[in-house]
């Protein structure tokens, strides 16, 4: 990971509330193959993903997760 990307991630993380940080920790600790609908819902609530038909995709600014499904 290059320095610019790391700096951007730190900036994003610093802007998260404590609840958002907790949810992000849960997401990071989960294996992608066991992501539940509830957890995917948290990603949407946090603005980390958006619903696109039957799948979840990264937000348009590309700051976060890529496609989940």
Q: Model-found features: residue ranges?
A:
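A short, conserved structural fragment
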Residues: 44-54
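Intrinsic-disorder/low-complexity regions
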Residues: 1-2, 60
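Accessory beta->alpha helical hairpin/"wing" motif in late/C-terminal subdomains of nucleic-acid enzymes
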Residues: 53-69
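Short, hydrophobic-biased segments on the C-terminal half of alpha helices
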Residues: 40-41
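Short amphipathic alpha-helical interface segments
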Residues: 2-37
């Amino acid at each position: 990971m290059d320095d610019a990307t790391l700096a951007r991630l730190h900036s994003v993380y610093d802007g998260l509330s404590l609840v958002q940080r907790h949810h992000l920790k849960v997401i990071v600790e989960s294996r992608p193959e066991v992501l539940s609908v509830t957890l995917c819902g948290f990603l949407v609530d946090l603005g980390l993903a958006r619903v696109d038909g039957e799948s979840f995709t990264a937000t348009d600014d590309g700051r976060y997760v890529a496609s989940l499904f």
